């Protein structure tokens, strides 16, 4: 009986968690306070930077569906937990 109850609780938890969208920081610039709820299917947060930008002014953060290949002098970091791209 306890096993059945535990199984039902686990199924309910997985169902509830799977329906939530990812939340990522979304902004341009060094300091980022704005949070964005990502669209369905966008399960990654990213931080895109220009290499050699000393002050971090060319930094973009947001949500992504897939990983892109960085161009020359670019660095893109991806993560898959809420608010991980700070």
From Swiss-Prot:
The keyword Secreted applies. InterPro entries: Snake_3FTx, Snake_toxin-like_sf, Toxin_cobra-type. Disulfide bonds join 24-45, 38-63, 79-84. Keywords: Disulfide bond, Secreted, Signal, Toxin. One of its GO terms (cellular component) is extracellular region. Expressed by the venom gland. The keyword Cytoplasm does not apply. One of its GO terms (molecular function) is toxin activity. It holds the Pfam family Toxin_cobra-type. Gene3D superfamilies: CD59. Residues 1-19 form the signal peptide. It is found in: Secreted. Belongs to the three-finger toxin family. Ancestral subfamily. This is Toxin 3FTx-Thr5. It comes from Thrasops jacksonii (Jackson's black tree snake).
């Amino acid at each position: 009986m306890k096993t059945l109850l535990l199984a039902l609780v686990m199924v309910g938890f997985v169902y509830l968690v799977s329906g939530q969208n990812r939340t990522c920081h979304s902004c341009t610039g060094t300091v980022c306070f704005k949070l964005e709820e990502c669209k369905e299917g966008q399960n990654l947060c990213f931080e895109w930077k220009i290499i050699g930008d000393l002050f971090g002014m060319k930094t973009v953060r947001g949500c992504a569906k897939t990983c892109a290949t960085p161009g020359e002098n670019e660095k893109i970091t991806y993560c898959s937990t809420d608010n991980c791209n700070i």
